[in-house]
Amino acid sequence: MKEKRNINNNFDLGPDAWCSYDYHASVISGTNNFSLATHERKGGVNDSGFIWVDQTRWSADTPENPISILPLIFYRSWINEGCINLEDAQISVYLRGDNLQLDGAQCYFWVLYNDTRWHYTDIPLVLSQNKWADKPHLFSIKKEESKWNNSWTNLPNGPEPLSSVIKNCESYGFSLVGFKQEVTG
């Protein structure tokens, strides 16, 4: 039987290592450029803590196919944790955009392992506008490759198989994909 774990980012004390990825700054600096999310102690769901990021902290990641923005990214190593098995995981999330100009973009959950990223395109996530949703967006991780898109790999012989990435996930987050102009807000 698989061990069940509950990971809860409640943002009571801080941003729990959530960041944005700025691809263009990374190209200029020659190293990955992440900006820590801003933490607010109040104002979240039921006046809880929450985090926020905006377009000053992200840029389109042009090696991704399709081109993606990675506004919320979390590496487990940032909190001294190893990979996590997300097989059949249940995800519950509140996502909010204040004056967010999506320009056709959809929001997706993604996973990364061994220089390979897969976006869970079967479930576009709802971004409530200018207020918190009444209930969280709930979804389950499925291993069916038809429900995913391999957006990037740095491996010379092709991407890491989806099942391996889900089982050994070292990073996960939320992406914006399908925009005509870079998302702002």
Role assignments for model-derived ranges:
Residues 174-184:
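Short beta-strand-plus-loop segments that form exposed binding edges in beta-rich domains
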Residues 12-59:
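Extracellular glycan-recognition surfaces and repeat-rich motifs
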Residues 2-13:
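Boundary/junction segments of secreted and surface-exposed precursor proteins
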Residues 101, 161-163:
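A short beta-strand-loop micro-motif that forms or neighbors metal/cofactor-
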Residues 1-4, 28-29, 62-63, 127-131:
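Exposed regions on extracellular, virion, or secretory-pathway luminal proteins
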Residues 67-74, 78-156, 183:
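Extracellular ligand-binding interfaces
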Residues 164-176:
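Noncatalytic modules at the cell exterior or secretory-pathway interfaces
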Residues 28-33, 149-160:
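Surface-exposed intrinsically disordered loops and tails
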